[in-house]
Amino acid sequence: MEEGSMFRSLLAILQWWGFNVTVIIMNKWIFQKLDFKFPLSVSCVHFICSSIGAYIVIKVLKLKPLIVVDPEDRWRRIFPMSFVFCINIVLGNVSLRYIPVSFMQTIKSFTPATTVVLQWLVWRKYFDWRIWASLVPIVGGILLTSVTELSFNMFGFCAALFGCLATSTKTILAESLLHGYKFDSINTVYYMAPFATMILGIPALLLEGSGILSWFEAHPAPWSALIIILSSGVLAFCLNFSIFYVIHSTTAVTFNVAGNLKVAVAVMVSWLIFRNPISYMNAVGCGITLVGCTFYGYVRHMLSQQTPGTPRTPRTPRSKMELLPLVNNDKLEGKV
């Protein structure tokens, strides 16, 4: 790889890490430090900011060409995806409301396992035995982390776990519902974020509206807090742009490894800021999980490099877009 190309790849990875970790930390700060305990409303703010941002990028600045979708397909394909997309984001923010960033990020590493199991159980897809074997350290690491978590909260744990299922469902549905459309992260947000806003707006208003009014009256500096909340939404959209940049600046393997290292960075930064207690065995469990995710990505990449004469598993990844980091769900959701 040329020196200039290596520099661009490194820059792309660093800015992606920066936006991703900042959004996660800001969301946790909003819930914990600002005492704004309304995950539905935070998610809705992110959807609105992402809708506006995607419109500006595509329609006003014309930095990305619009991928045209038939009106019928918008409701038949995009809307169901947007519903799962919305649930996925909300569950992530709900889990952040109740459990530490370190625990939440580790649980989300369970996504490869839930994806493989769902495809096997529901869609009856065959997987090479090496895929199953590579999931063992992920599952073991998650179990060790969960039983040794000092700030364990069952509701937050379940939200994060169901978030993994939502991520897996979204990924699987995308293969069929979005077939024929080559969406990038910006076009994905352009179509899905408005639907997600529509889906979540009324529930957020009904369930959290009165609580937000009470918070606004009781908070010593509500306007400053609202600026922080709005800023998190703007940064969440910027994250989508960073994802687009890093996908086109790195190889699949580099992207996978960088995605797993990003989780380690998020865990470390969150601990430095929030100082949530982490036991030795808890840290070991987190480490095992991340190593397992990296190994899983390596196995899938090796299977994808098989020669044409070698039997392939039906879902051996065929492109970089199928090898996005396995410990986050940035492929279709960005992080709005």
Swiss-Prot record:
One annotated Gene Ontology cellular component of this protein: membrane
UniProt xrefs under InterPro entries: Sugar_P_trans_dom, TPT_transporter
Keyword terms: Membrane, Sugar transport, Transmembrane, Transmembrane helix, Transport
Lineage: superkingdom: Eukaryota
Gene transcribed to yield this protein: UDP-GALT1
GO biological process: GDP-fucose transmembrane transport; UDP-galactose transmembrane transport; UDP-glucose transmembrane transport
Membrane topology field: Multi-pass membrane protein
Alphabetized Pfam families for the sequence: TPT
Chain's role: Nucleotide sugar transporter that specifically transports UDP-galactose.
Spans traversing the lipid bilayer: 11-31, 38-58, 83-103, 131-151, 154-174, 193-213, 227-247, 254-274, 278-298
Family label: Belongs to the TPT transporter family. TPT (TC 2.A.7.9) subfamily.
UniProt GO molecular function: GDP-fucose transmembrane transporter activity; UDP-galactose transmembrane transporter activity; UDP-glucose transmembrane transporter activity
The UniProt record lists the keyword Secreted: no
Listed name of the protein: UDP-galactose transporter 1
Record bears the keyword Transmembrane: yes
Organism the protein comes from: Arabidopsis thaliana (Mouse-ear cress)
Cell compartment(s), UniProt: Membrane
